[in-house]
């Protein structure tokens, strides 16, 4: 394991990551979570390219879009229009007229700041050049592109011109100034990154002689571009001699460095695959990356404070010539796309959403087109998912039914956040009538959109529906407008039980006309008439026995209309319960009061608290008072409380005194009483007895009495029974969490690096002065225990039965986010939370039958000496440490075990285990930690650096399952440590998995590796993994498919299939399920993204489901049944449960006939648990065919 000192790397172990509230429940292999769009998905339509001349027709088109569920109109805002008169002479009048028309229709408006030319490209129906005055700002050589044949292109400014950023900054600033008043209708802004509004080079331009499916041409032949390439190479290598050494050339001058002189020959002669070729392609893309950073920074500078919306940019779907063997990916590379991983990372770094196109297209990868658009969409979308980059989609060409189905497949498979259809005239005729294409768009795309209940700009109608139908639908139209398609829109559950709710933007209409049904053609009766709802909030109650229902003004009693997630100011109040069922009576400062007693507050996610969120519009404070709903009020000296926007916690005062308000949510420090019994009223102690959880109350074990005080004051506890009460009241015990007594050989572990997993409590991000900085991979990022708690369902639904989290001890460095540089053993690091929050995590994991393993470091502390002293007491004594200097490469290479155990690992202070005081304190500490937390197992870091004698003592003191990290490839060396600990991470198997599955080597290596199991005490408890936080991700290191080395998922799936079905405890590192592909530390420690619809998440969930339902696959015996270079099979058995696993490691389909199975007779039918095919044993054997890289798991 590697560590860093100062700015060095430190290995931190974690593997896990979970969730965002995933709703999938895994009940059977075919019942994993279905694919879905993102929670905020919306469907938009692209407006015309040219100016609108007939506003009446355009407004009819907009109204039809609105009536059919379209969210927004996306519009090119042409630089050539708005600044044509001269530098900084802007005219925005046309686009203000445009925005007003959109606003009138009740739609949103998504502007594209189009800094490119319109005209000359496929689909262009206008001619809008760049502002003519631009040519005076620089030379043509600087500002234009030039291709291989010498054609000069001025579709967009060259990113290499130094003035490009300044011009865009001025344009963005003027837009922000002029459209600040339209912020309510602008949910997003797009940036043009180059030709056709895409971040690319103008490599395929018909006016330059290109026609489909031509490769296109490189655009790096101006002197400016050539000099930029030369400078970049000199900067990279440092001298011409080193360039020659790298490229195998004999250049005598930097001026001899040029882009490829023959673009076609660059491919046919193999130049693209040479060191020179790779350097050129990498530099060529880097120009686009830098340009994206420049325009992204300018946009955030000018737009964030004004609009506060997401900003996006687009890359082109260059899908042809992808698999042409003569020039693989030539079209993409001419456009500037050499490494999608790196390019999409730039979107992440620039905090920009990514729009991708050609979602409607299918692959046809044969000559002459070699077109693979569907594969390309999958590749780009997968990388974006893995990196947490938000995706939006477009079609490339007009589309129909099958195209819409293809779009639906992609947006749901990869959790897209939006889709924009090109263009409006394909959906709506000039008279406002729909075309045939609109129905397909509505069926497959608009139907996926989430209700926009709060963001509209017109009049709004909010309806609470008292449930007659359990799942009511509302079929409606703005009065005089168009109806929704029957049965209409499904209403969502309201914040008050027994009601559904919807808010509809009706544009300029004054009423909403509606009817209700159950979605199955059963309609609410109103004597065949529709109901009419006025603007504002109304409550509808169905009539009895088929009679018409009634409409009353306002929300139902107890509702909180302001809790709907509006776009205005919000106040969230946590109320520490004095009243068991508190009400809040409130008004936005200066506004109107709720009707007394106000709104009943709901139980918060933190025990002992109630909570409410109120939308206060443009007000800056919420004025409030609390009561119990029965006219008993909290006292604040007759004054009301004032809460500012954001989150606050209110604690009632003692003895009638005023309560206190502090900023932020409560810490969650809650004492859980396992079985606590108390009287609810001291005056009625013979009355009902309740058993509940008590919050923040200290009770002695024996006889105690708990009583809520009156008037909302804090609770009290006394150490005797109340007069006349039962003297044998059972208070249970105030205990810490307890272990699940886990059989670890049955578990499947998800490894979590806590700081990089999920930020559930931003209030602790800057703990101890070591601030969170997401832009620096070596510093804290904000993940914490609350984040893991929030994502437990994400982990559970993936089928994992255990989590392993990185160390929890307090650190004292801005670089110690990983937890391996302990300062205080007896304190939890505040970045992660508190001891109470850690206990809560353990309890809630145990509630879901998830065991918890914690990483611990007993070899060393952080690097606190010399100069800064030692770790915190009692680890603050010089003789508790070795002072033998750093372990060197020579020590490792010569296997100097004495130095390996007694030297400093990367400068970290090595503990002296031979000192009894040190050894005893470490054993005391681990007993304390286990007792406090109730964790179920330990992962020990840097075990090969710890004396084996101490390990044995430590293992006995812990008296729990221990798994050691012995970073070494020799199974005899690693296996010896299982004589002192319960288990070891199987690094020898890791190296074999990497070779066999990641680099297509012989499956016989698996057989050879299993022959080394004799070195382990019990190989069934070896931790088996494909990668972790100390090594490159599997997808980074894997070789990929020959001829298409970007295609690595099949290799990963084969490795996962092996890992989750073979002997040992499988351990999957967080992010694997999202297709993460980071390289060496810290690139392999990415922040998590939680897409439960990701193909890899679903695949892992299916494998875990099979494993969890078959004891044989957990810790059953394992016997090899077949091995050759490309195929492997084994059988696992336990107590009558039999499973046979087949793995094809080839890139071709493979068929084998395999026999000699145990405990299975002729005629036995076996079913593949990963799909639906089955086989039957005949003559003692099975014949199976597996697709390339496929894994099959057959059971009875």
Swiss-Prot record:
It is an enzyme of class 3 (hydrolase). Disulfide bonds join 118-126. The keyword Secreted applies. Ca(2+) binds at residues 83, 87, 170. Residues 36-454 are annotated as: Beta-amylase. One of its GO terms (molecular function) is alpha-amylase activity. Substrate binds at residues 76, 116, 124, 314, 319, 357, 395-396, 423. Its EC number is 3.2.1.2, 3.2.1.1. Its cofactor is Ca(2+). Residues 1-35 form the signal peptide. The active site is at residues 198, 394. Sequence repeats lie at residues 455-558, 565-668. It holds the Pfam family Alpha-amylase. The keyword Cytoplasm does not apply. Binds 1 Ca(2+) ion per subunit. InterPro entries: A-amylase_C (IPR031319), CBM25 (IPR005085), Glyco_hydro_13_cat_dom (IPR006047), Glyco_hydro_14 (IPR001554), Glyco_hydro_14_CS (IPR018238), Glyco_hydro_14A_bac (IPR000125), Glyco_hydro_b (IPR013780), Glycoside_hydrolase_SF (IPR017853). It is found in: Secreted. Residues 544-566 are annotated as: Disordered. Keywords: Carbohydrate metabolism, Disulfide bond, Glycosidase, Hydrolase, Metal-binding, Multifunctional enzyme, Polysaccharide degradation, Repeat, Secreted, Signal. Residues 669-1196 are annotated as: Alpha-amylase. GO terms for biological process: polysaccharide catabolic process. PANTHER family: ALPHA-AMYLASE 1, ALPHA-AMYLASE FAMILY MEMBER. The precursor protein is proteolytically cleaved to produce multiform beta-amylases and a 48 kDa alpha-amylase after secretion. In the N-terminal section; belongs to the glycosyl hydrolase 14 family. This is Beta/alpha-amylase. It comes from Paenibacillus polymyxa (Bacillus polymyxa). The lineage of its organism: Bacteria, Bacillati, Bacillota, Bacilli, Bacillales.
